[in-house]
Amino acid sequence: MASVPAEAETRQRLLRTVKKEVKQIMEEAVTRKFVHEDSSHIISFCAAVEACVLHGLRRRAAGFLRSNKIAALFMKVGKGFPPAEELSRKVQELEQLIESARNQIQGLQENVRKLPKLPNLSPLAIKHLWIRTALFGRVLDKIVHYLVENSSKYYEKEALLMDPVDGPILASLLVGPCALEYTKMKTADHFWTDPSADELVQRHRIHSSHLRQDSPTKRPALCIQKRHSSGSMDDRPSISARDYVESLHQDSRATLLYGKNNVLVQPRDDMEAVPGYLSLHQTADVMTLKWTPNQLMNGSVGDLDYEKSVYWDYAVTIRLEEIVYLHCHQQVDSGGTVVLVSQDGIQRPPFRFPKGGHLLQFLSCLENGLLPHGQLDPPLWSQRGKGKVFPKLRKRSPQGSSESTSSDKEDDEATDYVFRIIYPGTQSEFVPQDLMDVSMNNLPPLWQPSPRKSSCSSCSQSGSADGGSTNGCNHERAPLKLLCDNMKYQILSRAFYGWLAYCRHLSTVRTHLSALVNHMIVSPDLPCDAGQGLTASIWEKYIQDSTTYPEQELLRLIYYGGVQPEIRRAVWPFLLGHYQFGMTEMERKEVDEQIHACYAQTMSEWLGCEAIVRQRERESHAAALAKCSSGASLDSHLHRMLHRDSTISNESSQSCSSGRQNLRLQSDSSSSTQVFESVDEVEQTEAEGRSEEKHPKIPNGNPANGTCSPDSGHPSSHNFSSGLSEHSEPSLSTEDSVLDAQRSLPAVFRPGDSSVEDGQSSEATTSRDEAPREELAVQDSLESDLLANESLEEFMSIPGSLDVALPEKDGAVMDGWPGEADKPSRADSEDNLSEEPEMESLFPALASLAVTSSANNEASPVSSSGVTYSPELLDLYTVNLHRIEKDVQRCDRSYWYFTAANLEKLRNIMCSYIWQHIEIGYVQGMCDLLAPLLVILDDEALAFSCFTELMKRMNQNFPHGGAMDTHFANMRSLIQILDSELFELMHQNGDYTHFYFCYRWFLLDFKRELVYDDVFSVWETIWAAKHVSSAHYVLFIALALVEVYRDIILENNMDFTDIIKFFNEMAERHNAKQILQLARDLVHKVQILIENK
């Protein structure tokens, strides 16, 4: 008999499996808006539920149906529970249907077609048919709940459903899946109608050559809503072209019966045959033959509108129900030709097949597609070993058509056939006698001999067939005059309402868009063509003599043509405001010296603070280990809590057990929503540090370069609540809750040296990219601490340095993971805290915001110059340090520039910026904005200064600013005015106020959407546009990005999630030159609208 713990573990394992499957089904329902009945998640869910229901089932409850215990159980439950009784009836009907189908498959095929709704179920679906049907019928949760309430009748005592806790949990878990909609309608189409972005762009490329040439950017000034009665004729070619291309792709409603490329068609007599793709499609209603020129299939049509329209005119679409005869001509030296003759006797252009039996294969597919209602006359013959062959008949074709011949000659002899398409079981509408019986009076007006009759429908109905009198003629003129008058009134009415709508829209433009652009229009051609941009020769002249080109002219060149890549390093500091246009070389050198001095000073300040933080954390960790080691109730794993990459904090009044509990509640500081670390990681963390020793004192002193006082110890904690969350124990003190970022303790710092290498780590046993080891020996840990302490002594050993004994605290410590940011850091009021959307932590800031009286009495780390680093500042800096290190490590690692040394530069610049703006702190995405600057400038101090200038504008886009909502509102106004059709689609889908797919674009200035070379071009254009055309140029780039793909969005009726998915797949694959040109055109259009020219 299994032990009690083993049974409990089995129940938990079964329950965990069900939880996982429920989670997957709910995720599928949310992301795809429906759940496929044949989804693999349904199968695995049914298997998991069945395992739980059968666990501990009594043999008596299972009955004698050993092969299907679920069926026996549900049938027994059905005797006293109506939902289960109804389920049993449905499933038994399904089983009979499936069994009957299996039997009929052995017999006649037509009998199978008479079966009502034959279910197409996989073997696994049939295996779990009872659970599956109960789920789709929304009674599974009710039946399981009934089993839980009456478990003693059906289950042994160790069964999952007998457990007073696990049984109700299982029943509750099933409520969610039973509330969902399960359908085959959407899903059957889903695999065809939800193609990737590549597929959508490819389809659009094929048929876009026939779209209207007045694209959204070339429309009239204002886009009045289309009235189909007037503008529909212009739209028909584009719609038919799109539908034509869509029809070429097989979907759930249309089957591709035959496809062959390089089939020749001669559209006109005066031109050569054109190769193309011939395809035969079948739907439930009709069979269609299509032929598309290769130029359209390959997207290789010329740029001229004439060429595009001509090739679309050549495309052929034929409904087979309109075809009566097929004339087949075979030649010995070619593959064969098919001529289709329609019911009215018109012959279609011949299709010439290449060699290789393709004509016979086409006829075979056509004959199979006509079945069961239609057939070829004469039918193709079947020959053993060869399949379908041409019939060998002797002059049996109908009179009036070409004769089909047969002979005893070889098969490759030239032979002609005429096949007729007939439908034996139906009354043909193409019978010649029916046509002959039609009276001349009942013919369409187009076929009437008298042209006058066709102009007036009333006369043609009342007049005689012999011809009309003069009365009829006079009678016809009255409706004609009335028709002309109506047309005149309609034209005037449309013109008036169009003018009225124009005036209203123009008022909206002036109200909402006038502030988005500069009202002075700068020409790209005056005083010279700006298409070449700012070249090296022009820049060299300007540097030698700043009076040769005015600032506005340089900005105009950059706006219309960009900056030559070789001179970007020299030009960008001017664009970003590091230098002012017109500065002399001496003035620029003075600015550089000031920036280098300021950067060195900032570096020394935060490096000094970082050194104190890291050493203090080592002290706290060692003290915590000593206390935890003395506890007799602790298991052996807690003796190895120190991980060399761990993040720790010294929390007062905490026991070792609460430390272990909080250890498992640490939140990752990335922007993901993962809150809990895995148990394996916790055990590994505990196993790697049991041998760390505590050092009672550390040598401490003032940092290099004479550290000045940073901001006060109480900077605003605005926007850090989610990054500084705490746990629920009310006795935590922020005075001692510092985080350990033990990756790179600042090593051997040289006084007066502010170079990048000041921030490098000298820990002999650690590396940022090294994977954690299973264990650290005691000796290795001690050596690591000694090396770190020696590095700190060297850094602090400056004349006048002062040793400061850091306070030691008793109590538990919490061991965490590198990069955590979920610790208390401030003593400010909760009123100043706000949420960050990047979800640094999901734990609320609670009692640890208050500083205890005992903590206030303890000394803070100080330098010899009197600078005091308050515990609050240490906490706040450490929180941001971990965020920075996490983002730096994953910043564009695939790009060639970001080696380990350059990543260190990136970290130094970001830490320096955050030190100067500690009240704002680091937010995910800032590294993305700094990275391109560092790539171009390749100088820490210069990149730091330019990044500071850039963030003056970009800071407002982050959560602590309010610019993002303004961007969304402006995007709404722009799309409403410039592309009303797209706006209507978004309004229809309820997304017109939520342009969240633009969020990443505005946050990072399109950095994630483009490759690096394109990012450089877009950024410098944005910076120049502020002075040339618009300070909100990012809006027009975003609008251009939408407009480039607007036809794809409209054609596929994309909603909010579809648009996000599409642009995520298209990231780094956009044509930046096209987008920038379109953005400039859009700016110019708005400027023209405002001027009302």
Curated annotation (Swiss-Prot):
Residues 562-1026 form the Rab-GAP TBC domain. GO terms for biological process: positive regulation of transcription by RNA polymerase II. CDD domains: PH_RUTBC, RUN_SGSM1. Its main location: Golgi. Residues 301-350 are annotated as: Required for interaction with RAP family members. Changing Y277A: Abolishes interaction with RAB9A. Keywords: Cytoplasm, Cytoplasmic vesicle, Golgi apparatus, GTPase activation, Membrane. It is found in: Golgi apparatus, trans-Golgi network; Cytoplasm; Cytoplasmic vesicle membrane. Residues 385-397 have a biased composition (Basic residues). It comes from the Eukaryota. Residues 377-412, 645-778, 810-838 are annotated as: Disordered. Changing L256A: Abolishes interaction with RAB9A. One of its GO terms (cellular component) is cytoplasmic vesicle membrane. SUPFAM superfamilies: RUN domain-like, Ypt/Rab-GAP domain of gyp1p. InterPro entries: Rab-GAP-TBC_dom, Rab-GAP_TBC_sf, Run_dom, Run_dom_sf, RUN_SGSM1, SGSM1/2, SGSM1/2_RBD. Residues 687-696, 766-776, 820-829 have a biased composition (Basic and acidic residues). GO terms for molecular function: GTPase activator activity; small GTPase binding. Pfam families: PH_RBD (PF12068), RabGAP-TBC (PF00566), RUN (PF02759). Belongs to the RUTBC family. Interacts with RAB9A (GTP-bound form) and RAB9B. Interacts with RAB3A, RAB4A, RAB5A, RAB8A, RAB11A, RAP1A, RAP1B, RAP2A and RAP2B. No interaction with RAB27A. This is Small G protein signaling modulator 1. It comes from Mus musculus (Mouse). The lineage of its organism: Eukaryota, Metazoa, Chordata, Craniata, Vertebrata.
